């Protein structure tokens, strides 16, 4: 298939974003950010829906052979197992996903957990600013699936 044929099918030129994934990954992995102290973390809970939730699924697979218990929540509530040794990673590319916003509210009420949010903005960014929750604003590319490497490598960088 040549580019002309591809562009007739891929009218939004998603292939250009996918072609740039290695550069996007490198940019976010090498970005200077505040690191999280993991020495006392024995559980990580990822929360996100759709394409945002897939990032948590990937981390669950990556960490499956470690001693860290990993949960991926695609719903509204923080698991009761969360405690002071838990890192909660909330991911919403849009920043407006209802389930993830409610999960964030639930996690914020559980003050023992270490909490960090990754979003491109929206209501979630505003909530984090208002409640003084640590968050990283990540660029959104075209769609959640196109934004996958920017979110994945931003989280790997903490």
Give names to the regions the model predicted.
Residues 1-29:
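Cofactor-/ligand-binding subdomain signature composed of acidic, glycine-rich
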Residues 24-40:
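A short, well-structured juxtamembrane/interface segment
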Residues 39-158:
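Glycine-rich phosphate-binding loops that contact phosphosugars or nucleotide phosphates
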